[in-house]
Amino acid sequence: MAQVTNTYSTYDAVGEREDLSDIIYSISPTDTPFMSGIAKENATAVFHEWQTDALAAAASDNYQIEGDEISFAAPSATTRLGNRTQISRKSVIVSGTLDSVSKAGRNNELAYQISKASKELKRDMETSLTANQAPVTGDDSTPRRLAGLESWIKTNTSKGGGSGADPTTSGTNARTDGTQRAFTEAQLKDVIKQCWDEGGDPSMIMLGSFNKQVLSGFTGGSTRFDPAENKRLVAAVDVYESDFGAMTVVPNRFSRSRSAYVLQPDMWGVAFLRDFQLM
């Protein structure tokens, strides 16, 4: 096989136009199921606080005689909790010349970089919110740090052996990891029961990809069907039927892969002191 003498080919020519697609492809995930699934509210100080309360235990011996002289019980005070506001940022700088030249895939370089940084910031926030991290008060040389999801869960847990320990007080210190073990349905059912017994009504199970696949094999999810019109059994378990109601199963790429969370989303929220801003 040989080329005819003096054939002028693409390898010799000058001035061929580039074939550069006008689309920029990215498969980097931007879903933030925890932050997107909980309440949003405003903070007015760097330490955002709220109160919790509980009812007295139900009693079966609450029966009195007629005309009894009342003995007043001392009221119980509310519990005051709080979390630090954390400053997160992404910075971009673009030259005026770059913004002026012709580019593939975007017209305005600064706008493109801001959009990209905003998505990265959102991922960082999801990672911080679901982290096992204790709060930091901060000072002029130390940044404030929020208490992550795992530092708030001090009861209703199932953890591995060894030195594993729950946080001593909600939102004040991180949990101590125990020895890692296989995720089982018995563990999941135990935690759901603990939550329900304590008055909770959990509706979400959040976990990483590995444990999501493990959960797909649990008995509680084996009756999960697609829409009623076709009754087709699907492989992915999006709803887990527990003894205390159906629970949405939500995979999260940014929470700790070693942990699975049983949550009641309406009892969680994120407060913004300064929402997303361009400066």
Q: Which sequence ranges carry the predicted segments?
A:
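Flexible, glycine/threonine- and acidic-rich loop/arm segments that mediate assembly and lattice contacts
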Residues: 1-279
